[in-house]
Amino acid sequence: METQLLREQAIFPSKEVLRDALGNVYPVLEDLETRLSENEFALTFEWHYYKDSKGWLCKVCHKKKTIFWLSVWDGFFKTSFFFLERHLEGIAALNIAENSFVIEKEWGKMIPLVFNISSQKQISDLLKVIGFKKVSK
């Protein structure tokens, strides 16, 4: 069963806390954050505690646009994108492995696309979706 971590409001998810929580998956997150913070993507990572979900979530943004949400789980981190139905054709054209993500039940008009990231091999598909989300309207 999947267990979400980072539930304590008083404990901010610093690099040390993330390293302890993710173990050998932490270098994957660290590399992703470095790559996404650089000029090509220029994304920012904003950690906030959300009382409704009772946990820390990271909102990853380009300027004011939310690109994806990141949460930390036991053995992996989860990236959740929210798309409209009109974006599905563009996502299908990205040529990403079908087993690398899950499209979850619609949430209002939004369709969640979720990656459970546990290895560096998954990052190339994730970067394709990030690039698509960044330019989609």
Language model feature labels by segment:
Residues M1-E38, L43, Y50-K51:
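Charge-rich, low-complexity N-terminal segments
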Residues E2-L5, L36-S37, T66-K78, L113-I117:
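Charged, low-complexity, helix/coiled-coil-prone segments
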Residues T3, S100-K137:
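Well-ordered alpha/beta subsegment
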Residues V17, D31, A93, Q122-D125:
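Exposed alpha-helical structural elements
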Residues L18, L22, A97-F101, L126:
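Generic structural signal of hydrophobic/aromatic residues within well-ordered alpha-helices
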Residues H48-K109:
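Short, conserved beta-strand/beta-arch hydrophobic-aromatic motifs that form part
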